[in-house]
Amino acid sequence: MADMTKEEFSQSIRTYTLNMYRLAFSILRNEPDAEDAVSEAVLRAYEKLGSLHRAENFKGWILKITANEAKRIYRRNKWSSAVEWEENMSPAFYDEHHELWDAVMKLEQGHRDVIVLYYYEQCSLKKISKILGCREGTVKSRLYRAREQLRRMI
């Protein structure tokens, strides 16, 4: 178990908040829900801090919790009509790569997740497979297909 003080936990959360938000937003496509997912993930992570075995694994661990929270919120809200993501998107977040980000957000969920984790969060294939709970080969094929779709879109 990683012995982390409250201050170390807070600092680690501050370090990865934007990463957590981008991942949650890629799943939910809605700014308020993504913010809720991040908040819930922080609470859940603090409650389960004892399950973190090594502090070096914090990023992957917190992103896995964030993905799970975002998916839980998505399932909860699935029945309601979705608000168009463009209406809720914070422009400062993607100014420079607007066209690419638009294309990424149009990908199906599985492809969007691997693109965000690989390119935006710079996670390894192995780490992505752990976060998403699938095999590394599946991650590779999703990444390949997502790139092909993006090439056709742009």
Please tell me what each predicted stretch does.
Residues 2-3, 40-57, 76-78:
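Sigma70-family region 2
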Residues 13-31, 48, 153:
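Amphipathic, Lys/Arg- and hydrophobic-enriched alpha-helical face
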Residues 20, 24, 34-45, 65, ...:
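Short, small-hydrophobic-rich alpha-helical interface motif
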Residues 50-53, 64-83, 145:
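Arg/Lys-rich amphipathic alpha helix in sigma70-family domain 2
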Residues 72, 79-105, 124-126:
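Internal acidic/polar
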Residues 132-154:
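DNA-recognition helix of helix-turn-helix
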